[in-house]
Every structure is written in structure tokens, then in C-alpha cells.
């Protein structure tokens, strides 16, 4: 299991959104990824501030609202 991959559900561990679940949308480089979640804004995040979970979402489209609904169904 690759820890940091597109579609992986993670928990943010730092910042104002700490403790919230998010999904990795894109890998920017070795230090940053783009994350979105129900209570997480669509923005880049340092991978050291993420704790990957065993859950993964299949990203069928780039629609943020669809991704948020799938994430809510996991919680």
C-alpha cells in the first residue's frame, strides 16, 4: 500500500483543520499534495502534516462535491 497516493483518505494533523478527514486529489511534488474534504478547503498541504488511513476513494471525476459526498459516506 502506497501511503501517499491519489484518492487516499488522510487525517490532517496540523493547522486549523487538524483532525479533519480529506482526500488527496493531486501530488504536486515530494513534499506537497492537494487535499479536499468535507471541512477541508481545496488547497495544497505538506505531506508531513497528513496521516494516511487505510481507506481509498476511486476518483471518477474532478467534481469536488461528488468527492465530498463519497468521503461523508465513509465517515
UniProtKB/Swiss-Prot annotation:
Write the record's keywords in alphabetical order, separated by commas. Ribonucleoprotein, Ribosomal protein
Per UniProt, what is one Pfam family of this protein? KOW
Q: Name one GO biological process term.
A: translation
SUPFAM superfamilies reported for this sequence: Translation proteins SH3-like domain (SSF50104)
| Any one GO MF annotation of this record | structural constituent of ribosome
Record-linked InterPro entries:
KOW (IPR005824), Rib_uL2_dom2 (IPR014722), Ribosomal_eL14_arc (IPR023651), Ribosomal_eL14_KOW (IPR041985), Translation_prot_SH3-like_sf (IPR008991)
Please give the superkingdom of this protein's source. Answer: Archaea
**GO cellular component labels:** ribonucleoprotein complex; ribosome
The family this protein is said to belong to: Belongs to the eukaryotic ribosomal protein eL14 family.
Specify the protein name: Large ribosomal subunit protein eL14
What is the name of the gene encoding this protein? rpl14e
Amino acid at each position: 500500500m502506497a501511503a501517499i497516493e491519489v484518492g487516499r483518505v488522510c487525517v490532517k494533523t496540523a493547522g486549523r483543520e487538524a483532525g479533519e478527514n480529506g482526500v488527496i486529489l493531486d501530488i504536486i511534488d515530494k513534499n506537497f499534495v492537494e487535499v479536499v474534504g468535507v471541512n477541508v478547503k481545496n488547497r495544497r498541504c505538506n505531506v508531513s502534516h497528513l496521516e494516511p488511513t487505510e481507506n481509498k476513494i476511486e476518483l471518477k471525476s474532478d467534481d469536488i462535491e461528488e468527492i465530498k459526498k463519497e468521503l461523508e459516506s465513509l465517515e
